[in-house]
């Protein structure tokens, strides 16, 4: 991460106000000020990292737990029928704030916004080789 604090770090530190919905030692969550739908929240690690793969295992684990807890509460409180969890890494992926963050976007029967993408058929030979390389890279 750069030396300059992200807007999210500044929110965590209380420099900017927000509508907080959750906080623990590792995670901070608040309502998005430009929501896609009612109940749209951002879930961020307190650890400053630009990309998901740069987070510590502990922050990653705590984010996973928080996403589940917050999603459940959003569904119960808003009456949403479904939700999207979106996380972008890098500008080509649509990331505009370079501090890891997840969007939980509630969906309602009248919701029209979709994150559906055009798909392609996978080449089985290429897929086999790629899967082996990714697997080896994890070990």
How would you name each of these model-derived features?
Residues 1-139:
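HIT superfamily nucleotide-processing domains
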